[in-house]
Amino acid sequence: MQSREDAPRSRRLASPRGGKRPKKIHKPTVSAFFTGPEELKDTAHSAALLAQLKSFYDARLLCDVTIEVVTPGSGPGTGRLFPCNRNVLAAACPYFKSMFTGGMYESQQASVTMHDVDAESFEVLVDYCYTGRVSLSEANVERLYAASDMLQLEYVREACASFLARRLDLTNCTAILKFADAFGHRKLRSQAQSYIAQNFKQLSHMGSIREETLADLTLAQLLAVLRLDSLDVESEQTVCHVAVQWLEAAPKERGPSAAEVFKCVRWMHFTEEDQDYLEGLLTKPIVKKYCLDVIEGALQMRYGDLLYKSLVPVPNSSSSSSSSNSLVSAAENPPQRLGMCAKEMVIFFGHPRDPFLCCDPYSGDLYKVPSPLTCLAHTRTVTTLAVCISPDHDIYLAAQPRTDLWVYKPAQNSWQQLADRLLCREGMDVAYLNGYIYILGGRDPITGVKLKEVECYNVKRNQWALVAPLPHSFLSFDLMVIRDYLYALNSKRMFCYDPSHNMWLKCVSLKRNDFQEACVFNEEIYCICDIPVMKVYNPVRAEWRQMNNIPLVSETNNYRIIKHGQKLLLITSRTPQWKKNRVTVYEYDIRGDQWINIGTTLGLLQFDSNFFCLSARVYPSCLEPGQSFLTEEEEIPSESSTEWDLGGFSEPDSESGSSSSLSDDDFWVRVAPQ
């Protein structure tokens, strides 16, 4: 018989089903995750340690090695001394790590002498080892590159290369190409070649003794440039002209290379209009002496016997065999240079994620440029765009209300993201002036506060700064450039910004009830105000005048005015069906003060109805066809089509502060092309 003490225990041990009791699974409690010693990290420790080591270096405390930097040609004991810490130099610089830890002779010496670096550059690099900061300028960048290349300081070397690439211009591009070639920096060499190709026409006319020109390149460097498909030239004459320039700069030394140089000229792309130029080319002494057979063979292959005989009255029959042999490559019909297919086109900008359309309004040719925002994460945060175009036809795109800034290089058909802007805005505008991007106007997307701050971006430095603020806030306005000044204009006021004095000046206002669009043409501001009224501002006279009204067509919902080459175009659209735009293009006749319908062959354009336009020089051979954006009126919109919700909101009027509902069109910001 069980006792009372045993009974409960036996009942507890018994399984409910009569079998063995399952084993108890022991799971860790919450406290088990927090056992053991606490581990803390001082986030300021590394910076404080580096700062303390720098203070020791400055005070020459605890230094265990002295680096003597001797000027080339000088003897030991005449150089500049740098007391340093071995551990710091070895930790920051692979060159010194090998020196001090690899069993080299210098690892046991209290003093080390260096000959292949200048003292100023070494001082900057030692400071970098202690601080992680480096100061670059036009005066020291090439010497710093050479020193950092020797000391294997990769960050400084690449920073110097990036600095040089951002400062490429007509006066230094050939020197930078030679510099990159000397150090074997492929990326910088490619960037210099691309700049030369893009500006080849201008460079072909440069010959100042104070500048390095294409004639200063080595043979290998010149051949690499002349073989580029990406040369931005309208005629092969320019390429031939540069080849002759290079040969004539040193005829005795370079003359024997004439045949090799002229092989880079694509003779198949000369036309009958080039006959006078070719006749003059054949009379040049260096051509007669070194490569007459090469050019004669090329001309005979290009023009045939009839025209060839008119160009070369007395052909050198003895050289015909060598000509045909030396010009085998010319018979392969090489492609045209990139610049030969360049066209000034009207660019349509619509929804931020849609491709941008490049259109020739006269021929109806249509191409598309991918938007850089298509694959951007959180694209719903981008509602509109602000776009401007530089004199070099680079397209700068600012997303709203985000802080993104992008640049499109037409010759490379590629987008590059630049440094983020300082402020988030919506309703802003953007303009390019003398190497700077200006962004102003609009309001804070969160608080709705109108912004007077003006952001300025330095293209060469890839940096932003705030300049003189606006005297008054701007919404629903245009920002334009005339000569060296910015003009901000809306229906009630206009201000002019002078960058040389960093100040805003008040101008004669438009004083109209409405403001639609404005652009610069012949150094005057053409403005569509109360439709169909159009007025023109002359900045020299500081006065407005009214011109003939724009054409007024019923159901037109979009008016855009742009400078297209040497013409002023008015582009209007009406929307007979959802997201289908019937586009009409008018050209302004200055003498008759009237708008002429050019009868564009564009049909229905399936594109955002609130598009805006700019004009730029692009390269159709680099672009994809855009015919898929043309449609017929009777077609039914695809079920897969999606209408993007830009989010309706009301916007306080810039002038009165009253609240009014705005259409989507008010969110699109435009800048007239230069």
UniProtKB/Swiss-Prot annotation:
Residues 1-28, 631-674 are annotated as: Disordered. The gene is KBTBD6. GO terms for cellular component: Cul3-RING ubiquitin ligase complex; cytoplasm; cytosol; nucleus. It comes from the Eukaryota. Transmembrane segments: none annotated. Kelch repeats lie at residues 386-435, 436-484, 486-523, 524-564, 567-616, 642-673. As part of the CUL3(KBTBD6/7) E3 ubiquitin ligase complex functions as a substrate adapter for the RAC1 guanine exchange factor (GEF) TIAM1, mediating its 'Lys-48' ubiquitination and proteasomal degradation. By controlling this ubiquitination, regulates RAC1 signal transduction and downstream biological processes including the organization of the cytoskeleton, cell migration and cell proliferation. Ubiquitination of TIAM1 requires the membrane-associated protein GABARAP which may restrict locally the activity of the complex. GO terms for molecular function: ubiquitin-like ligase-substrate adaptor activity. Its main location: cytoplasm. The ATG8 interaction motif (AIM) mediates interaction with proteins of the ATG8 family including GABARAP. Keywords: Cytoplasm, Kelch repeat, Nucleus, Repeat, Signal transduction inhibitor, Unfolded protein response. It is found in: Cytoplasm; Nucleus. This is Kelch repeat and BTB domain-containing protein 6. CDD domains: BACK_KBTBD6_7 (cd18482), BTB_POZ_KBTBD6_7 (cd18273). Changing M99A: Loss of interaction with CUL3. Loss of function in TIAM1 ubiquitination and degradation. It comes from Homo sapiens (Human).
